[in-house]
Swiss-Prot record:
Coarse class of the protein's main subcellular location: mitochondrion
PTM-bearing positions, type Phosphothreonine: T292
UniProt GO BP: error-free translesion synthesis; mitochondrion organization; mitotic spindle assembly; negative regulation of macroautophagy; positive regulation of focal adhesion assembly; positive regulation of mitotic cell cycle; positive regulation of mitotic cytokinesis; vascular associated smooth muscle cell proliferation
Domain of life of the source: Eukaryota
Cell compartments where the protein resides: Mitochondrion matrix; Nucleus
Name of the molecule in the record: Polymerase delta-interacting protein 2
Keywords per UniProt: DNA damage, DNA repair, Mitochondrion, Nucleus, Phosphoprotein, Transit peptide
Organism: Mus musculus
SUPFAM superfamilies per the UniProt record, alphabetical: ApaG-like, YccV-like
Targeting signal (transit peptide) range: 1-21
Underlying gene: Poldip2
Length: 368
């Protein structure tokens, strides 16, 4: 087993928090970044040790979380794998993997331009590459400390009644990319505080990791697969701002003698530079298979105008869209402001809104 002792430092009475690391593998820490959009520098040592009092920031409490393992370069993490999120810093546990198609326009831009794709509205054709994501549970103790940098601490579903606009959410459920996972081990039999942890996972010290799926988890995954499934991920970088979009089909409802199709989309904004920028505006174009084209403009996103800095480089949020057609496309731009008052536009990669063609009945909420 590799690694470094993971500790969490919570600032009493504030939302700022960090983790300090002590590693057994040279002076370089196993993980260099993490936390609520980015952490302060980590402490390292050539041998495993506990941090001395002089390393502790005044007013913060250190507590042992576990021991880091070497992140997997190949293969998948198993059900029950504990981890720290490398970008948002929360503790979590893997429930099961998803095999997604990643459409990376940054990779495509390095290849010769191909014929325009009408569905992509003038953009180059991008080939999808298989990439692993995971359905995870977030430790409830950490949710308050990431709420300023991530608005996706819950997965939303259509409600199980006739109101076509009613949604409900399962808090502490998230989707995580393979490279976001910093795996660790813990001797605690209940290391993650979430109401579904013990309902979904069983402690088995003979296994590695020592948490195995209960039949409840397998049944839940099977019944809700159409409404949980992550299939496509779209990514593009403009002027060192990377935008990642993940759309999810939520189902169809009947309203006023017509069908209304719903999608949820998750967006992560990442500042890959050290310059501070602030999101000011969004500009969406929404095309429906029925032939309509809608333009949506507004200030910020989800009521916020997040600042992306070297210390907190990422922001993530979810929103929803409905169409009176079974498919469509979305694309657009985010307008950012620099400290000198100048502005620049960042492209949102175009993505498809596809419904489940095999859907026989609309979802009736989450099945247990």
């Amino acid at each position: 087993m590799a690694g470094c002792v993971a500790r969490r430092a919570l600032a009493v009475g504030s939302r700022w928090w960090s983790r300090s690391l002590a590693t057994t593998r040279g002076s370089r820490p196993l993980c260099a970044v993490g936390g609520a959009g980015g952490l302060p520098p980590v402490a390292t040592a050539t041998t495993r040790r506990h941090l001395s009092s002089r390393n502790r920031a005044e007013g913060k409490v250190l507590e042992t979380v576990g021991v880091f393992e070497v992140p997997k370069q190949n293969g998948k993490y198993e059900t029950g794998q504990l981890f720290l999120h490398s970008v948002f810093g929360y503790r979590g546990v893997v429930l099961f993997p998803w095999q997604a198609r990643l459409y990376d326009r940054d990779v495509a831009s390095a290849t010769p331009e191909k014929a325009e794709n009408p569905a992509g509205h003038g953009s180059k054709e991008v080939k999808g590459k298989t990439h692993t994501y995971y359905q995870v549970l977030i430790d409830a103790r950490d949710c308050p400390h990431i709420s300023q940098r991530s608005q996706t601490e819950a997965v939303t579903f259509l409600a199980n009644h006739d109101d076509s606009r009613a949604l409900y959410a399962i808090p502490g459920l998230d989707y995580v990319s393979h490279e976001d996972i910093l795996p660790y081990t813990s001797t605690d039999q209940v290391p993650i505080q979430h109401e579904l942890f013990e309902r979904f996972l069983l402690y088995d010290q003979t296994k590695a990791p020592p948490f195995v799926a209960r039949e409840t988890l397998r049944a839940w995954q099977e019944k809700n697969h159409p409404w949980l499934e992550l299939s496509d991920v779209h990514r593009e970088t403009t002027e060192n701002i990377r935008v990642t979009v993940i759309p999810f089909y939520m189902g169809m409802r009947e309203a006023q003698n017509s069908h209304v199709y719903w999608w949820r989309y998750c967006i992560r904004l990442e500042n890959l530079d050290s310059d501070v920028v602030q999101l000011r505006e969004r500009h969406w174009r929404i095309f429906s298979l029925s032939g309509t084209l809608e333009t949506v403009r507004g200030r910020g996103v989800v009521g916020r105008e997040p600042v992306l800095s070297k210390e907190q480089p990422a922001f993530q949020y979810s929103s929803h869209v409905s169409l009176q057609a079974s498919s469509g496309h979305m694309w657009g731009t985010f307008r950012f402001e620099r400290p000198d008052g100048s502005h620049f536009d960042v492209r949102i990669p175009p993505f498809s809104l596809e419904s489940n063609k095999d859907e026989k009945t609309p979802p009736s909420g989450l099945h247990w």
